[in-house]
Amino acid sequence: MPPMTRNTRNNPNGRFPGAFAPEDEDDLPKSKSQRKRDMTALQDIGAELESLPKDRLARVPMPEALADAIHAARKITSHEGKRRQMQFVGKVMRGLDDDEIATIRAALEGFKGTSKAETARMHLIERWRELLLADDDALTKFLGEHPSVDVQSVRNIIRNARKEKELAKPPKYFRELFQAIKTALEAKDADAAPDNAPEPEA
């Protein structure tokens, strides 16, 4: 029988402390490259927050310390000052827990989805405008899909938009047509909303 050493006395199985089972991966220290990737990801999130419109930023759930750091960064105009403040934003973000970071990520992803929908709507309005200016038959189709439209008003806007284009005038009616189409689409959406559905008869 081999002589008993201090280690074998403390560990009858002959293993060093902590050697009874493999370490959980979550308990292993992160590599330098992984820490760098995590830090870069947090800096990117901080930059997204700093660039958000004011109303959207207000809707992102975040700790007060981070909100204060972001608001301070938005007020700084000098490049170097902004850079230092954004470094501080990154430092604050490294102190957040996983749930807080996940909540912020979810809010930002939600905004991206909204932006895609807004972009699609913008393209639809521009496409309708292009069709209405190019073809009188397009107005008949548009009116069929948007019955709430003031027909005479839209006809006048289209006529004036065509005329100002021919005369190379500023696009006043061109912009008005965009707004008229936008209003018509919004009215159609409102009519289709569940709140506006007719109540069933008793």
Curated annotation (Swiss-Prot):
The yes or no answer to whether the keyword rRNA-binding is present is yes
- What Gene Ontology molecular-function terms does this entry list? ribosome binding; rRNA binding
CDD domains in the record, alphabetically?
YjgA-like
Q: Which Gene3D superfamilies match?
A: PSPTO4464-like domains
Instruction: Say yes or no: keyword Transmembrane present.
Output: no
In terms of one coarse class, where is the protein primarily found? cytoplasm
In this chain, the stretch annotated as Disordered covers 1-39
Compartments it resides in: Cytoplasm
So which domain of life are we looking at?
A: Bacteria
Entry GO CC: cytosol
Biased composition, Low complexity: where in the chain? 1-13
Against Pfam families, the record matches this protein to: DarP
Q: Which InterPro entries match?
A: DarP, DarP_sf
Kindly give the SUPFAM superfamilies that the UniProt entry links to this protein.
PSPTO4464-like (SSF158710)
From its record, what is one biological process in GO terms? assembly of large subunit precursor of preribosome
What keywords tag this UniProt record? Cytoplasm, Ribosome biogenesis, RNA-binding, rRNA-binding
What is the residue range of the signal peptide feature?
Answer: none
Function description: Member of a network of 50S ribosomal subunit biogenesis factors which assembles along the 30S-50S interface, preventing incorrect 23S rRNA structures from forming. Promotes peptidyl transferase center (PTC) maturation.
Q: Of which family is this protein a member?
A: Belongs to the DarP family.
UniProt-listed NCBIfam families: PRK05255.1-1
Q: What is this protein called?
A: Dual-action ribosomal maturation protein DarP
Give the source species.
Answer: Cupriavidus metallidurans (strain ATCC 43123 / DSM 2839 / NBRC 102507 / CH34) (Ralstonia metallidurans)
- This protein's gene is called darP
